[in-house]
Amino acid sequence: MNRQLVNILTALFAFFLGTNHFREAFCKDHDSRSGKHPSQTLSPSDFLDKLMGRTSGYDARIRPNFKGPPVNVTCNIFINSFGSVTETTMDYRVNIFLRQQWNDSRLAYSEYPDDSLDLDPSMLDSIWKPDLFFANEKGANFHDVTTDNKLLRISKNGKVLYSIRLTLTLSCPMDLKNFPMDVQTCTMQLESFEYTMNDLIFEWLSDGPVQVAEGLTLPQFILKEEKELGYCTKHYNTGKFTCIEVKFHLERQMGYYLIQMYIPSLLIVILSWVSFWINMDAAPARVALGITTVLTMTTQSSGSRASLPKVSYVKAIDIWMAVCLLFVFAALLEYAAVNFVSRQHKEFLRLRRRQKRQNKEEDVTRESRFNFSGYGMGHCLQVKDGTAVKATPANPLPQPPKDADAIKKKFVDRAKRIDTISRAAFPLAFLIFNIFYWITYKIIRHEDVHKK
């Protein structure tokens, strides 16, 4: 009886044991078919600690592939805004998303079901990151409203995506010879600060390396679609460092400068020509008009240079302002010439009267020299063959001067002729200058810039 009871208990134990093994096998098979893993029971915190925490053995101070091939970091930027191009300081301001991607095999995982993990920005201190900086940066700031504008994403294969939002003020050396019809090329250089090319290499993303927000406009420039991508590897005493760059081509719009500089100065020049139609006797009016236009043109020229740097070469706007000032000043000098010529008849008559007076004095002196009336000889010097010979002056008296009104009319006509010629010569000369000016800067030099 006891042996029979033992056999029954043994059979029941074997049955339950077999059932338990079957259940475990079934659960494993079911989990494998459903994509679940036994480690799913790990909490996210435990998983991250195991992946990059203290228990993982991950060291953020050591780059991937340590003492091996360099880490290839792929970069691309998305431009949110582009503006504040300043000529005086020669820089520009831009707001971008900077995205860097690299592979860190130490962060590869297979225990977690998700293909990628979006981590909190605070985890950035726990992983290795490239030491990227902007070589031509003059000022920059991060954004933390309402939270840090940073993104960290890790894929199963160990690929890391690091995105950050930045506002940068970058240096942009400008050539202002054609200002304000110029095309500027501004660069953005991304360089490694610590790691040489033996450890780190930057590359542009093959698909869409530089993206621009839709509808992005600049107040004074047109941002051209073509952007030059290239390498700018730097050689220092400390080694050779990786560097990539993008060049933005900015074409200046002339609308503002036409309204503020070109059209006002053109009108001032035309206003100075009104003097040619004012009577030459109206000296106060013509002088006041000439001086006013000269001073206004000088102020306009100074204002055009106020917002520009002090460069050693001549700009297109400088040539325009200088020629306009020259035309205005020439119009003032033209009236000085007209006034001088119109008053020359007075000087001419004054010289005639002086010459006549001098001639009379000479005649009187000459007559008194040969007058012997005190000795009863009168005007007779000698008698030859019964004929008395009178003393005659050596130089005959000059012809009587022309009528004063005729002389005045002659000089006034000359002055009027100067005004008449100026009415046509000044506009014609200014028109010729405009033709050469606009052809040179809008066509010839513009094409040269595009060829470069």
Curated annotation (Swiss-Prot):
It is a multi-pass membrane protein. Its main location: membrane. It comes from Rattus norvegicus. Residues 279-283, 337-420 are cytoplasmic. Pfam families: Neur_chan_LBD, Neur_chan_memb. The record marks 295 as: Important for obstruction of the ion pore in the closed conformation. It comes from the Eukaryota. Residues 28-256, 305-315, 442-452 are extracellular. Subunit of heteromeric glycine-gated chloride channels. Plays a role in synaptic plasticity. Contributes to the generation of inhibitory postsynaptic currents, and is involved in the down-regulation of neuronal excitability. Plays a role in cellular responses to ethanol. Glycine 1 binds at residues 99, 163, 238. The chain crosses the membrane at residues 257-278, 284-304, 316-336, 421-441. This is Glycine receptor subunit alpha-2. One of its GO terms (molecular function) is glycine-gated chloride ion channel activity.
